[in-house]
Amino acid sequence: MHFGTYMGAYWIFKFILFPLGFTIPFLSFLYLSLTLGVPFLGYHYAKTYRNKVCGGVISFAHACLFTLFMYMFASLLVAVAHYIYFQFIDHGFVLNEYSKLVDEASKILQRTDEEKEFIRNVIDTARTLTPVDFTMQFLSWDVIVGSLLAIPTGLFVMRRGNRAETPNITPQP
């Protein structure tokens, strides 16, 4: 999957910005902007596939499947990056930063003790997850969101051929 590789590389680059965004706020903004750009990039790749590979004609089902497989392949590639990061690089950095953010937000926002305790329990539960757990969670999330994005992308990309140009093929008995 040619375009899935490009999308996966884009997601890996985007993921590199995620932990860096905790220390450099602009990178967090850039990460969010690139995340919002994923559907548009998926549309661009599907449109390029339609025009260059399919001769400008593609059905809804074909466009939907192409987009779905593109997102699935990208999800597999970025899952490798997620695993490498959480297994060998992170060492609890992301969860510690989230914990600091929660502490700062609790000081600013007036939270009840139950809300604070709930958030603490969520972070403590997340600390028990292994790198494989994080990777599988992100992988399943990426596949689900990719499946949902494939439907509108398929609708926007589909283009029916001109009936005058399509040959009338009848099945032979």
Q: What residue ranges belong to the model's regions?
A:
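Transmembrane alpha-helical insertion/packing segments
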Residues: 1-50
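Alpha-helical transmembrane segments of multipass membrane proteins
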Residues: 2, 6-10, 14, 38, ...
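Membrane-helix interface/capping segments
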Residues: 44-62
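Alpha-helical transmembrane-segment detector that highlights a single hydrophobic TM helix
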Residues: 59-72
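Functional transmembrane-helix hotspots
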Residues: 80-109
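Short membrane-interface loop/juxtamembrane segments of multi-pass integral membrane proteins
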Residues: 102-130
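Individual transmembrane alpha-helix segments
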Residues: 124-147
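Short, charged juxtamembrane terminal tails flanking transmembrane helices
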Residues: 161-173
